[in-house]
């Protein structure tokens, strides 16, 4: 893919997700269960959401902890949506929107007590993301990272073929635990995002959005790939999905 084509593709993908509450699968109740089981953070806690999209998790974290959240995303469109949503919820004083590259943060070592990232680590590769982010997390600090993961060792060929092309570094949960350990984290727990919330909170709103879009050559390609992804998940959601890895910096 040429640079121009890549730029057009990213623009079309951004436009497809414009206005959606979530830019990927997730669920507030599911996240709250994880948060309720985390160890107590310092009184002056430092929280970051990397790859925040339009802020579904950042806003939840701000509400839950009543603490500032540094929310980072490379899309200015999504950052603008986050600012609007924060204002609507009366949380603008707690949200620190940062338009930037989550792989090139110039933050001090140990400057984050809770690092949260949903559906974004794959952009760097799970292990690479953890190695880049580990220095940011304080000693014994917590990271909660969701990562596309295989759930079983016996895998259907169509799913393998699709993901070898879409995300060749995708591993199973055991492999990802090993990767986390190699990156300076202890794995405290893992939690699989239920397949039904993929549909309820992400795929169904995405389908409605597709019906509203004006079709262009670049959007046509993105829509075709998105529909292929949805069909695959409909058939094989027992075999893969997002696992949330709750990690402690060691």
Regions found by a protein language model. Give the residues of each.
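Short, glycine-/aromatic-enriched active-site segment of Class I SAM-dependent methyltransferases
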Residues: 148-167
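Short alpha-helix
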Residues: 169-184
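Conserved alpha-helix/loop element of class I SAM-dependent methyltransferases that forms part
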Residues: 24-43
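A short acidic, Gly/Pro-enriched loop at the edge of an enzyme's catalytic core
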Residues: 105-114
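A short glycine-rich, Lys/Arg-flanked "PGG" loop and its adjoining helix->strand segment in the class I
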Residues: 128-142
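Class I SAM-dependent methyltransferase SAM/SAH-binding core
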Residues: 48, 54-104
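Conserved Class I S-adenosyl-L-methionine
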Residues: 191-250
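A short SAM/SAH-binding and catalytic strip from SAM-dependent methyltransferases
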Residues: 114-127
